[in-house]
């Protein structure tokens, strides 16, 4: 071939500045593009052999070599694939944006598996100019009579092409790095980048350093054809003792060779996700997880995706074990295209809530743009996301049905993920509705229907404690007869009545309320995660007639002693009288005060805040509006409940003009506040001082 020079067939001379600054967001991505081209060349050659159009040499093993040379400031990518003729160089290299892979598939679409061809974009080779001032190509085609070709370009639109001296089939691309990118010919940096993008490419990838001084010792029988022998190491002779008489005889060890350090194999050509789930062991799944995510905490469980129709998708999703107190929930879903790494956490393909997991997904059918770094947001991509969501929901539902005990163990770890998924995806929420669990006060895990079946109090206890209008005990049989007479009316009212599920957000802070509930044989569920509040709001919207109420939002009838109407009237009068004293002592006219006969006689006072008001306060805190008056929104403030069964409340009721009445009122209020929420600094200072005064009174 006569030497040739010319201009690249492009639309604009500004193509290289665009490639360098815009086409690829990560400059190290040229590694992926050039190695992918080499893998494609190897795959194509193997396909031609399978179709009978070429015979591979005996013992052929496809490979791509990455060779760093810090002294010459070069980076070389070498493959033993099908190579190129001068015409193909003209077509695939000199005409930018023409894809060799696309042309190859079109020609052999009836004979080959096009899914195995990685390259789609034609511009991949030109990513080399992101880091190189000059690029050389040396190539020799597999075709009979083909001549080697040498091609050069200095990053402008001019190139030169002539006969080359390459003698082995394949392609070698040499990058002469610019001064700003010399880090890429560092062996450690090269290893890092190749592992990042090419850890699972289907062709073996080797990394080496040109003219390395490093050596290794091997046995003579382990020598490979490409090994460079630096020294033959003669075996040592040693004395061997046999029998009674010691005789020196030569006992030779195997002959050894000192060779230049071999290229390092970087990738795994058959990653776990390419296998059928039935072929994978638990230990293989765990090893893969540790290797890919550098997380040595064992995952809870995993889902192996394996789909061939209507699109090709494989992958493994792991549910990591999360320390809820100390760790943020951040996952990583690695997206691959034919075992070539594309990016982490691409939201167009991976549903947002699944980004809390760790895993890999490989989909050869993904419609990528020219840089392979983004996805076209189309209907196909949406179907992929829907399929992944469905598989995750099916796995969780199946686990709950077939192994509820194991599902219960996982629940605390996976509940934030599932609840987030329900908030973000209506279809996922619909599938998971019957498999969402709630942990109750006894540590049992209940479904939503099971929570709704919890009775508010023990019916037998109601019968035993029933009294008439005058406070006299009523026999249980009378209660039953009366209940039967009112049954039809109650059934009608029950249909309209909201079903309340009580919940706890802080088991320590709300311990007094929990003890009261347990004493009354009532139950509540534990909701301590930040996501629980928006989640229960969604449940209320989707399930008519269900209401969630925090355990300290109100004093239910089940926590009160049964009283006659006469006693209720007396308490109302007491409340009116004592309310004036409390408001005066607290210097607070807005507080609501109630007097109730609580079953637990050890509790003197308690604070309640309606569910609506508390949620409004939480919302205001979220939007940085703390301290706003609830009444402006139609909400109620705090209510102070005084227990008429407690001696202190009885004392101030009878001694409202007493010397210490106001001090006792203040102490009752602060004790109630402490059980509800922490006191602010000023209130705590006063509380401590007052407590000391009370103890001083006890010493007199």
PLM region spans:
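GHKL/Bergerat-fold ATPase module in large chromosome/replication-associated machines
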Residues: 117, 135-158, 178-181, 188-700
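GHKL (Bergerat-fold) ATPase N-terminal catalytic module, capturing the glycine-rich phosphate-binding loop
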Residues: 1-179, 183-184, 192, 199, ...
